[in-house]
């Protein structure tokens, strides 16, 4: 079973492994009764197609990770989703709400190329970002739209800022799929405060959220790669959480997208758009 780990201080000056809850860690168990849950915690179902930038990355017919559309040929997702998966075997579905039901709005693509950040570190989840090039051009419309990125190297939203994270993870610990795309409101947590909860393992290119109260709210496995949207821009990309999803003792951690905007567009510009017969469109 694939998993991701981070190193935390041990009790005798050594280091112990801390298992992180990532999309890749639990999704292979998605059809086993009683497996650990992988779901948007404390959230609600959104109005169908009201988050038209959302993408589902699937393997063998099952949702595996999230992502979001930034260009008619490119989806952003998490690098750890492909640590032990062959991207060429995956599919990207756009325009979906209920993944288990056929919808005329859905557009399905194979993955022509997957470009993980060259400095991605699986052990710590540093630089956990990947670009997926579609094998065709997405047709933009009411159910399929682009999500804007923050300005390059922009400061992250201030602590306390309300943001939203969405995904198709399970809604119970017993493999119950959601009726449709789920979303939860969270608040930005100061990185230094978050870092103390994570034993100093975070870096400045990460971002944290918490519920803002005592309720468990946040993301969990199979939501990895999805966007944290603040002010209509993707400021974060779901990376990892603690053993218990939405637990304030281990705040949710994201890749801070603004730190990678230059790299993102450098990759897009360097690669020709496969199968394109017209003008490519990107979110600005």
UniProtKB/Swiss-Prot annotation:
Example of a GO cellular component annotation carried by this entry: azurophil granule lumen
Listed EC numbers: 3.4.21.-
Post-translational modification: After cleavage of the signal peptide, the N-terminus is probably further processed by CTSC. Processing by CTSC is probably required for accumulation in cytoplasmic granules; in the absence of CTSC the protein does not accumulate.
Keywords from the UniProt entry: Disulfide bond, Glycoprotein, Heparin-binding, Hydrolase, Protease, Secreted, Serine protease, Signal
Record GO biological process: proteolysis
Glycan-linked positions: 135
CDD domains linked: Tryp_SPc
Protein name as it appears in the record: Serine protease 57
Source organism: Mus musculus
Gene it is expressed from: Prss57
């Amino acid at each position: 079973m694939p998993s991701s780990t981070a190193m935390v201080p041990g009790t005798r000056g050594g280091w112990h492994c801390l298992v992180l809850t990532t999309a890749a860690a639990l999704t292979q168990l998605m059809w086993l009764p009683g497996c650990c849950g992988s779901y948007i915690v404390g959230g609600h179902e959104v109005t169908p197609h009201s988050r038209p930038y959302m993408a589902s990355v699937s393997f063998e017919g099952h949702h595996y990770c999230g992502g979001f559309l930034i260009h008619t040929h490119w989806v952003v997702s998490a690098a750890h989703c492909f640590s032990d998966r062959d991207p060429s075997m995956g599919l990207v579905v756009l325009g979906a709400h209920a993944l288990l039901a056929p919808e005329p709005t859905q557009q399905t693509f194979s993955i022509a190329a997957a470009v993980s950040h060259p400095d991605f570190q699986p052990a710590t989840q540093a630089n956990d970002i990947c670009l997926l090039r579609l094998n065709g051009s997405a047709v933009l419309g009411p159910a399929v739209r682009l999500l804007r990125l923050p300005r390059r190297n922009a400061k992250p939203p201030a602590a306390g800022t309300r943001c939203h994270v969405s995904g198709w993870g399970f809604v119970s610990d017993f493999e119950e799929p959601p009726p449709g795309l789920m979303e939860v409101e969270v608040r930005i947590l100061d990185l230094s405060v978050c870092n103390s909860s994570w034993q100093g393992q975070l870096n400045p290119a990460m971002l944290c959220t918490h519920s803002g109260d005592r309720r468990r709210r946040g993301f969990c496995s199979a939501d990895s790669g999805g966007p944290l949207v603040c002010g209509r821009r993707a400021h974060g990309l779901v990376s990892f959480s603690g053993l218990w999803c939405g637990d304030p003792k281990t705040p949710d951690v994201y890749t801070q997208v603004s730190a990678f905007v230059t790299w993102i567009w450098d990759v897009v510009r360097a690669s020709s758009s496969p199968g394109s017969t017209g003008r490519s469109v990107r979110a600005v």
